[in-house]
Amino acid sequence: MVMGLGVLLLVFVLGLGLTPPTLAQDNSRYTHFLTQHYDAKPQGRDHRYCESIMRRRGLTSPCKDINTFIHGNKRSIKAICENKNGNPHRENLRISKSSFQVTTCKLHGGSPWPPCQYRATAGFRNVVVACENGLPVHLDQSIFRRP
């Protein structure tokens, strides 16, 4: 009986040891996606916004050429990875059923080193993401909504 419990405990501990890195890796890729592409409530959406957020998010050493920020709530973005707010799109991607308010920051000027100067384009777009385990981990593109 005691030996059976020991084996069961060993299997349980080994199972715990194998599971967290996978979950942690999924969460770190999702967290990285949020850092690069999510800003719930932007303060302005012009070149000053782009220069400020790109610097705060660590995307300016060297200056990133282009980056899109999705505005709204995380639940709606996560729902793209499900049928609630997403449809299959090309190979292993999902496209949002609804459009999102987005700001695209594009590097303006010749130098790839700070101070980085950006131009902002704001609008409503459907977004295309790659998902892993039900979480968005890569923003592939954003598509302007047709009127």
Swiss-Prot record:
<comment type="similarity">
    <text>Belongs to the pancreatic ribonuclease family.</text>
</comment>
<dbReference type="GO" id="GO:0030139">
    <property type="term" value="C:endocytic vesicle"/>
</dbReference>
<dbReference type="InterPro" id="IPR036816">
    <property type="entry name" value="RNaseA-like_dom_sf"/>
</dbReference>
<dbReference type="GO" id="GO:0001525">
    <property type="term" value="P:angiogenesis"/>
</dbReference>
<dbReference type="GO" id="GO:0015629">
    <property type="term" value="C:actin cytoskeleton"/>
</dbReference>
<feature type="binding site">
    <location>
        <position position="105"/>
    </location>
    <ligand>
        <name>tRNA</name>
    </ligand>
</feature>
<comment type="function">
    <text>Secreted ribonuclease that can either promote or restrict cell proliferation of target cells, depending on the context. Endocytosed in target cells via its receptor PLXNB2 and translocates to the cytoplasm or nucleus. Under stress conditions, localizes to the cytoplasm and promotes the assembly of stress granules (SGs): specifically cleaves a subset of tRNAs within anticodon loops to produce tRNA-derived stress-induced fragments (tiRNAs), resulting in translation repression and inhibition of cell proliferation. tiRNas also prevent formation of apoptosome, thereby promoting cell survival.</text>
</comment>
<dbReference type="InterPro" id="IPR023411">
    <property type="entry name" value="RNaseA_AS"/>
</dbReference>
<keyword id="KW-0540">Nuclease</keyword>
<dbReference type="GO" id="GO:0005634">
    <property type="term" value="C:nucleus"/>
</dbReference>
<dbReference type="GO" id="GO:0032311">
    <property type="term" value="C:angiogenin-PRI complex"/>
</dbReference>
<dbReference type="Pfam" id="PF00074">
    <property type="entry name" value="RnaseA"/>
</dbReference>
<dbReference type="GO" id="GO:0045087">
    <property type="term" value="P:innate immune response"/>
</dbReference>
<dbReference type="GO" id="GO:0009725">
    <property type="term" value="P:response to hormone"/>
</dbReference>
<keyword id="KW-0873">Pyrrolidone carboxylic acid</keyword>
<dbReference type="GO" id="GO:0009303">
    <property type="term" value="P:rRNA transcription"/>
</dbReference>
<dbReference type="GO" id="GO:0004540">
    <property type="term" value="F:RNA nuclease activity"/>
</dbReference>
<feature type="disulfide bond">
    <location>
        <begin position="81"/>
        <end position="131"/>
    </location>
</feature>
<dbReference type="GO" id="GO:0005737">
    <property type="term" value="C:cytoplasm"/>
</dbReference>
<dbReference type="GO" id="GO:0004549">
    <property type="term" value="F:tRNA-specific ribonuclease activity"/>
</dbReference>
<dbReference type="GO" id="GO:0010494">
    <property type="term" value="C:cytoplasmic stress granule"/>
</dbReference>
<feature type="disulfide bond">
    <location>
        <begin position="50"/>
        <end position="105"/>
    </location>
</feature>
<dbReference type="GO" id="GO:0043066">
    <property type="term" value="P:negative regulation of apoptotic process"/>
</dbReference>
<dbReference type="GO" id="GO:0030041">
    <property type="term" value="P:actin filament polymerization"/>
</dbReference>
<dbReference type="GO" id="GO:0042803">
    <property type="term" value="F:protein homodimerization activity"/>
</dbReference>
<keyword id="KW-0378">Hydrolase</keyword>
<dbReference type="GO" id="GO:0043022">
    <property type="term" value="F:ribosome binding"/>
</dbReference>
<dbReference type="GO" id="GO:0003779">
    <property type="term" value="F:actin binding"/>
</dbReference>
<dbReference type="GO" id="GO:0050714">
    <property type="term" value="P:positive regulation of protein secretion"/>
</dbReference>
<dbReference type="GO" id="GO:0005507">
    <property type="term" value="F:copper ion binding"/>
</dbReference>
<dbReference type="GO" id="GO:0042277">
    <property type="term" value="F:peptide binding"/>
</dbReference>
<dbReference type="GO" id="GO:0061844">
    <property type="term" value="P:antimicrobial humoral immune response mediated by antimicrobial peptide"/>
</dbReference>
<dbReference type="InterPro" id="IPR023412">
    <property type="entry name" value="RNaseA_domain"/>
</dbReference>
<dbReference type="GO" id="GO:0034063">
    <property type="term" value="P:stress granule assembly"/>
</dbReference>
<keyword id="KW-0037">Angiogenesis</keyword>
<feature type="signal peptide">
    <location>
        <begin position="1"/>
        <end position="24"/>
    </location>
</feature>
<dbReference type="GO" id="GO:0005694">
    <property type="term" value="C:chromosome"/>
</dbReference>
<dbReference type="GO" id="GO:0016477">
    <property type="term" value="P:cell migration"/>
</dbReference>
<keyword id="KW-0539">Nucleus</keyword>
<dbReference type="GO" id="GO:0004519">
    <property type="term" value="F:endonuclease activity"/>
</dbReference>
<dbReference type="GO" id="GO:0019731">
    <property type="term" value="P:antibacterial humoral response"/>
</dbReference>
<dbReference type="GO" id="GO:0005604">
    <property type="term" value="C:basement membrane"/>
</dbReference>
